[in-house]
Amino acid sequence: MIQDDNDVLEPPINFSTVDEGIFRSGFPQPPNFPFLKTLQLRSIIYLCPEPYPEENLEFLRSQNIQLFQFGIEGKKKASSSAASSIPKQTILEALKVLIDVRNHPVLIHCKRGKHRTGCLVGVLRKFQNWCLASVFEEYQRFAGAKSRTTDLRFIETFDVVGLRDCLYGIIHHYYRLAYYASKKRRLLLYTQAQQDMQTYRHYKP
Amino acid sequence: MIQDDNDVLEPPINFSTVDEGIFRSGFPQPPNFPFLKTLQLRSIIYLCPEPYPEENLEFLRSQNIQLFQFGIEGKKKASSSAASSIPKQTILEALKVLIDVRNHPVLIHCKRGKHRTGCLVGVLRKFQNWCLASVFEEYQRFAGAKSRTTDLRFIETFDVVGLRDCLYGIIHHYYRLAYYASKKRRLLLYTQAQQDMQTYRHYKP
């Protein structure tokens, strides 16, 4: 939380903490790298189709940060179509990476940290059981005047129940078994749980 | 992070995570209590002079949450005066409570989570060495159209260097001593450090 030297830190635009070990922002530029170092990131979820810039890749290598790229196009014709440009399956894949604590601390970003990032954080909040009014309030806080009704509809209709049930099923199953297990048996259960988590990661609604 | 039942959670208005163990919001209402429970708060920093409502006090007692109240008046004549209504000494006292990890997880709130809360979070960001542009961006994200130039000036002119130096001095002193100390001597140092932290808590610029 506290810096030891007097160098002023510059977070990326639209930076914020989402939850413990989860951050969001617009595209990080080199002047933001000293700040990003303080977060001790383990991974970055990048939501644009454009290749990651070389100097950003260099920074990731130097900090041993894993890049998860989910190429979602920025919206082209904002007013001409009522359909969302956000693909559900891609956001679901990104959500699975996002809620896996082994990837934390993680930074989600797109270009401006408003729409694509806002949609992913929105479905995370639904996964966390937030009411829709609060999810929308948060989306709008970051999108401001650029808020899109299609994004709000995307978040509203996105189904997280199946994924949550799948995850809870696995956790509950092993939690119950491990309760009565010996130390050796617990290690075996751990390996089985890892395999089940692979299934969960390939979950499709 | 995850709820185990299907009850939808309703965070207070303008709720957000500020940093690890630090949250901000507008005034929490009873429908927000189930959500607040998930944060496992140890304390609340309340920035208004009005008495805390009985049902909120009841909730705090049931959850064993400590209340720190710093009565700062809401601004009355927004446009007639260039002076800030935020008292520096009070914000400094609140900042000292806020950065003390023994009070974490902590929720900061005022009435709407915009001005008084925005000023306290603003000086925290200066304490964390954030550049002023990023501090202002964050203030404005929550204040929106209600952003006040007097608040931004308050944050800009607030001096955190003295407090930081005082805190770092204590930490550095004991860190160095404890490095070479025996277990028994370390306990003694711990007691002395606690006393020094009292001095720090009474720090006045």
Question: Where are the regions a protein language model picked out?
Answer:
Chain A
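Cys-dependent protein tyrosine phosphatase-like superfamily
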Residues: M1-I108, R112, C119-P205
